């Protein structure tokens, strides 16, 4: 039997935890893609759309860090994991934080490589 997924209550989510989780460009990309994704998109689909060439265990590790930081909520559906960003909850707790981080990420991503 699979272990239950744990999610922090929104009151337990910290700015430091969010910044740590989003300090990795892969996780930042996952959050960005999840926000654009249709409802119910699972982790495997997100990984394919991001074109990430990484082992399933590495992908699971990224999702775990995002979940434990309180950025996403995940639910098991068979062998798949469906995740969504807690955007509304996070914006209520930390107004504008996630939007500001993602705006900066998109700006950096659009710059030509040096």
PLM segments and residue spans:
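Amphipathic alpha-helical dimerization/coiled-coil segments
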Residues: 2-14, 32-37, 82-114
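N-proximal short alpha-helices
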Residues: 3-4, 32, 39, 63, ...
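N-terminal helix-turn-helix DNA-binding core of bacterial DNA-binding proteins
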Residues: 17-55, 77-92
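Conserved acidic functional residues
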Residues: 24, 62, 95
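Generic macromolecular interface patches on structured domains
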Residues: 40-41, 69, 100
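Canonical helix-turn-helix DNA-binding module
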Residues: 44-72
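Short C-terminal domain-edge/linker segments immediately following a structured domain
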Residues: 61-64, 73-76, 103-106, 112-114
């Amino acid at each position: 039997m699979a272990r239950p997924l744990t999610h922090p209550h929104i009151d337990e989510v910290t700015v430091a935890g969010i910044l740590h989780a989003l300090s990795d460009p892969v996780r930042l990309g996952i959050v960005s893609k999840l926000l654009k994704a249709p409802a119910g998109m699972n982790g495997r689909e997100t990984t394919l759309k991001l074109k990430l060439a990484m082992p399933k265990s590495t992908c699971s590790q990224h999702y775990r860090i995002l979940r434990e930081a309180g950025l996403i909520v995940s639910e098991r559906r068979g062998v798949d994991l469906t995740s969504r960003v807690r955007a509304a909850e996070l914006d209520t707790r930390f107004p504008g934080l996630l939007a500001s981080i993602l705006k900066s990420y998109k700006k950096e991503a659009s710059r030509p490589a040096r």
